[in-house]
Every structure is written in structure tokens, then in C-alpha cells.
């Protein structure tokens, strides 16, 4: 069936004011005011607070639900999907969920049952999306106050006394209503800022292709890097987007077992705790900027490709190679420190901290105790997204998790064990060889490759362009004086519109600093997030007004073939 293209249109901003009853864990919030800012027909590029607002107040769920029906009718008439923006959407939407689910099917693109990106109302007869709610929290996670500061519209403070007990019938003062209205004005002002800060961004992308800071990075790449063409050996041209998509699809795991093995051999980083000084104040501590290290990791090394299952005997050669390489050689050949890359399951006997090493002296262990758990929980030992935890537990149920016999754990780390069976890649095994020692090893199974290539241009260019833009913007931010034409050279990384306003001195210092700090640095730091995800995780469903994980969409051995993505822009080897 041909996919129906839908046009999404920002039409309103939604918020509530609530009152609390009860104390402590028994505290409950209930809504006493529903706030709606109708911004249909407004050009967000020219939005002006006050002039372009149509703020209405409703005191009951039914009153506001009637308002939603008006938006739905408007969308059907103009053949668009109305988008209603909010901040921390599910808190404000909870009073409406049960009633909305009676009349519509509900589909959510969510991080958790209380943290959604979008929530769609779907007509049961036509199976058509008729309304979308969009949580703008994921554009600026520091709060509406920070969002307002970025776009130059401070959030109102101090005008609403939350200690008072109110009901939907309690009269509200003009001052209280002014306070309540400000939050539904901050969001369109922030969207205006985004449109001016990203010249490639159009209004029809908002609430559709642009939902989060990470999606801003994706769309920046799609509109500025994806169209670039490279020559193929045949003489034909290939866009960087197509080249990257082909690479990602080629590197997807071929079987469920291969997927599980790679999940078990996760290519993540490590944290460290020094047991010997855990209860002491330590001076002269050095710290590394891990965000910048992401870009060293993205740009500064070759990536392995074309993994294939091999016999343990071949993996034994890989093992011996890894264990023979010293730290100096790794640092001198950071771009490609090893001849082979692999994912293997290995059994180690009598593992302990390496005698005479700094790790033994200071009690620094490497391997996380979470890797040895048969089940993980979101927020505790496996991120915040419950879907990732569910998919991880499916892999663990299939037997792909680390195991131990008579182990000693402390500070969330493995210090010793009579025996461990572990899933490791070449980087992790090399690191383990620096920290631990063991008496015997046995390789059970795995996959390897000796094929390495420079990292894909599609991602590398994102990093390089934003890094250069960040440095150029930093210099301007330190030297620009509002109201005066900028006297120095403006590099080509600065968007034309912003460059023109700098040259004639009309750019406000507040806008430029916000663009530098929030947009440029934010997108630069968000590149890694576009690749750090599992394309096989399940989705959400709504039942009786409650969001929950749809277990029918989990990826298992039985449905592996049907769960393959039609297209993919996530490169696992990052």
C-alpha cells in the first residue's frame, strides 16, 4: 500500500494549571485551568508575542475537548494534520487521555509512558491521523524558563500562588491569567527562534520531521550534506545520503543470533571508581571532555565492516594479537590500533585485578556488574527508555549476557571471580587485558573482520562542519557588539541571514549567543545521538487512555525477518 503523505501544521499551544492535594507520596495534582493559544494562520517567522496570540481559558476537560474537535474539523477541511504544542505533554494531557481514547485510536512516538515525542489521535473509521500533540520538551530539556531565555521571552514568575487550594470554579485574577498565558507564548517564540537560527528549517517540518534536538541534527545533515554527490567507480554519481544508507543497511545483523551477539558485545565506554580512595578527598584530579571525545571517536579512527561468523581457532589468533599490543602502540595508531575487529564470547578462569598495576594499587575495576544481570530495568542500569530495556531483556533471555561463578563485586564493578563468561569486542578485550589478569581462557564462538574503512562522510562532515561553525561562532560571540557593524571577517560557516545582520549591527547579542550556545553547540554535541540507538526496539500502544509498550512489536527470533527496517540511517559500528 502506498504511504499517504500528510501535511502537518502548527495550530495551537496547550498548557494546564493544576492544584495539589495530599502530602508526600500521596500528593495528587488535578487541573483547574486549560490554556489554549490559537496560532493558526500565523507566520511563525514573524510571530510577535501579544499581537499574534489568541489565548483562551477553559475550566473543564469537556470544554477543552470541544476545542480539540474544532481543530480536528479545521484540519479535515484544509487537509492538514493540526499540531498542538506543549511542554511536558503527558502531565498536561493525562486528564484527557481516557475520554480521547473512547473516541479515537491513539498512537504515540514515545521514550516512556510518561515522556512522549508525539501523540496522535487516529480516526477509527478512516485510520487517518486527525490531530497530533507534540512535546517540545525534547527541543530544550532545561525547562520553559531556559526556552524563554534562549528566545528572549522570559517566563513569568511569582504570579501564581501554588499553595492555594483551587477548584475549576475558583475565580482567577487578571494577574493569574497573565501568568498562565505566558507559557503558551514561550513555545511559539522559541519556534520562531529556531526558524531564524536554522536557515534550512521550514515551518512544515515542525512537529513532523523536527521533534527533538537530535532530529534537528538529522535534518541539518539531510538538507546540507545529503545532497552532496561523490563519484562511483562506474563514473556515475552517488549522493552522500544514499551512500550512508547503503552502508547502514549492509551492516545490519543478518540473523537474530548475530544481533544478540552484537548487543552482548556493546561498543560502549567505561566508568571508573578507585576503591582505595573512595572515602577520601582527592586533589589534583584531571577530567576529560567526553563530549569532544565523541568526535574523536567519530572522526579519528577507521571503522570495521563486514563481520562474519568464524571458528574459535581464528578468534584465538585475534585474541593473541590483542593481548600482545601495548598502550604505546594503541595510542600511536589510534586510527587503527588492531588488525582485526571481532565480537566474541570468551570464558576466563580466576580473573582478578592485574598484580602490580595502577588498577590493583588503587582498586580500579572495569567491568560493570550490570552486564552480569539476567534482567535490567530502565533508569537504574540501562538508560531511561523502557523499550531499550525490554529489547535488552529479550536478548538476555536468549542467553546473551555475561555470567560469573564466585564473583566479587564492589562499586558496581567486577573485582574478581573464579570464572566469567563474557561478550567482548576487540576494544573491550584490550582494555580488560590492561586492568585484569586471568589464568586460562576459552573462546566459545564469535565473528570477526579484517576489513576497515574511513568513517562515512555523511557523519564525518556533520562533525567537521559543526565543529568549524562552533569555533567561528565562538570568536564572533566574544567580539561582537550589538548595534555596531561587526568589523572582522565572517567565515562561510555562518548562515547568510545571520551574517548579514552581524555586518550591519542589527543582530541582537542575545540572539547570537543563544544561537551559538543552544543551536550550534547543541547540534554539535547531538551528532552521536543520531547513531546511538537500537532500530529493533518495540513501540508503544494506548489502551484505555494508558500508554504501554506494545509487546507484539518486540523483535524476537520468530519474527526476525519481518522486523527488518525498510531503510536505515543508524550505523551500528559507532
Give the role of each language-model region:
Residues 7, 13, 22-87, 91-574:
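Conserved acidic
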Residues 1-7:
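Short Lys/Arg-rich cationic patches that frequently serve as NLS/NoLS or arginine-rich RNA/DNA-binding motifs
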Amino acid at each position: 500500500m502506498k504511504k499517504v503523505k500528510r501535511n502537518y501544521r502548527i495550530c495551537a499551544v496547550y498548557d494546564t494549571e493544576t492544584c495539589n492535594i495530599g502530602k508526600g507520596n500521596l500528593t495528587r495534582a488535578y487541573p483547574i485551568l486549560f490554556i489554549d493559544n490559537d496560532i493558526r494562520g500565523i507566520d511563525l517567522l514573524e510571530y510577535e508575542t501579544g499581537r499574534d496570540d489568541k489565548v483562551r481559558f477553559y475550566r473543564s476537560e469537556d470544554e477543552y475537548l470541544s476545542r480539540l474537535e474544532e481543530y480536528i474539523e479545521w484540519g479535515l477541511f484544509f487537509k492538514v494534520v493540526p499540531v498542538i504544542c506543549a511542554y511536558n505533554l503527558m502531565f498536561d494531557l493525562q486528564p484527557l487521555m481516557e475520554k480521547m481514547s473512547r473516541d479515537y485510536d491513539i498512537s504515540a512516538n514515545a521514550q516512556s509512558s510518561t515522556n512522549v515525542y508525539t501523540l496522535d489521535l487516529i480516526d477509527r473509521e478512516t485510520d487517518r491521523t486527525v490531530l497530533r500533540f507534540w512535546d517540545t520538551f525534547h527541543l530544550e530539556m532545561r525547562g520553559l524558563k531556559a526556552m524563554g531565555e534562549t528566545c528572549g521571552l522570559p517566563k513569568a514568575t511569582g504570579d501564581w500562588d501554588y499553595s492555594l487550594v483551587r477548584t475549576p470554579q475558583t475565580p482567577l485574577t487578571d494577574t493569574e491569567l497573565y501568568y498562565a498565558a505566558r507559557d503558551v507564548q514561550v513555545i511559539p517564540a522559541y519556534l520562531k527562534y529556531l526558524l531564524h537560527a536554522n536557515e534550512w528549517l521550514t515551518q512544515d517540518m515542525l512537529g513532523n520531521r523536527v521533534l527533538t534536538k537530535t532530529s534537528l541534527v538529522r535534518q541539518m545533515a539531510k538538507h546540507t550534506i545529503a545532497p552532496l554527490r561523490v563519484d562511483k567507480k562506474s563514473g556515475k554519481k552517488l549522493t552522500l545520503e544514499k551512500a550512508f544508507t547503503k552502508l547502514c543497511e549492509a551492516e545490519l545483523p543478518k540473523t537474530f543470533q548475530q544481533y544478540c551477539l552484537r548487543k552482548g558485545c556493546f561498543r560502549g565506554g567505561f566508568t571508573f571508581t578507585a576503591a582505595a580512595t573512595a572515602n577520601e578527598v582527592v586533589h589534583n584530579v584531571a577530567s576529560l571532555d567526553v563530549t569532544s571525545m565523541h568526535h574523536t571517536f567519530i572522526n579519528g579512527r577507521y571503522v570495521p565492516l563486514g563481520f562474519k561468523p568464524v571458528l574459535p581457532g581464528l578468534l584465538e589468533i585475534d585474541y593473541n594479537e590483542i593481548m600482545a599490543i601495548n598502550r604505546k602502540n594503541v595510542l600511536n595508531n589510534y586510527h587503527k590500533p588492531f588488525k582485526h575487529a571481532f565480537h566474541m564470547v570468551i570464558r576466563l578462569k580466576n580473573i582478578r585485578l592485574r598484580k602490580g598495576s595502577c588498577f590493583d594499587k588503587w582498586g580500579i575495576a572495569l567491568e560493570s556488574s550490570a552486564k552480569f544481570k539476567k534482567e535490567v530495568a530502565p533508569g537504574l542500569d540501562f538508560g531511561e527508555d523502557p523499550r531499550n530495556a525490554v529489547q535488552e531483556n529479550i536478548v538476555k533471555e536468549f542467553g546473551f549476557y555475561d555470567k560469573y561463578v564466585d564473583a566479587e563485586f564492589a562499586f558496581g564493578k567486577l573485582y574478581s571471580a573464579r570464572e566469567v563468561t563474557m561478550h567482548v569486542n576487540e576494544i573491550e578485550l584490550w582494555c580488560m587485558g590492561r586492568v585484569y589478569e586471568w589464568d586460562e581462557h576459552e573462546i566459545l564462538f564469535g565473528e570477526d573482520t579484517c576489513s576497515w574503512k574511513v568513517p562515512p562522510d555523511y557523519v564525518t562532515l556533520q562533525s567537521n562542519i559543526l565543529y568549524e561553525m562552533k569555533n567561528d561562532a565562538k570568536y564572533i560571540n566574544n567580539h561582537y557588539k550589538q548595534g555596531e557593524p561587526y568589523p572582522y571577517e565572517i567565515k562561510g560557516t555562518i548562515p547568510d541571514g545571520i551574517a548579514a545582520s552581524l555586518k550591519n549591527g542589527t543582530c541582537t547579542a542575545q540572539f547570537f549567543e543563544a544561537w551559538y550556545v543552544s543551536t550550534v553547540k547543541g547540534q554539535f554535541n547531538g551528532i552521536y545521538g543520531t547513531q546511538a540507538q537500537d532500530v529493533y526496539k518495540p513501540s508503544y500502544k494506548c489502551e484505555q487512555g494508558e500508554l504501554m509498550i506494545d509487546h507484539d512489536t518486540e523483535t524476537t527470533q520468530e519474527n526476525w525477518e519481518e522486523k527488518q527496517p525498510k531503510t536505515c540511517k543508524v550505523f551500528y559500528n559507532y
